[in-house]
């Protein structure tokens, strides 16, 4: 399966890029379900494995239900503002590879993009998996927007 989602973020591209590359800094911008974020188990911790700005580096996310998810950056280009990363396999998904990148748009703001490919173990899981990732990406984009709205508001 393949997905691509984009959203405009009201912030300069370099600032959004810095936020994205702070690989274990998700708790700064990730919205809780109560704040309008993703429904389901809460993100409890996000720790960095490796050095900040090193490639590879991994973020280990622990959810409220005890599930642990690792995402590892294996390519980062600060000039083109693009990363490639992989997510650890789970009981329903394998081979998740994604790219996140930032483009400047008119007015000094930016667009953030996420493209991914993955396999599902059971063909019946295709639509639910796509819907889940689309919800995750929408929550990420909204978290970025609110982070920069709070930051500029003081």
Residue ranges of predicted features:
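Hydrophobic ligand-binding cavity/cleft-lining segments
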Residues: 1-50
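Beta-strand/loop substructures that line and gate deep hydrophobic ligand-binding cavities in soluble
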Residues: 86-139
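Basic/polar N-terminal segments that are highly enriched at the extreme N-terminus
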Residues: 1, 152-154
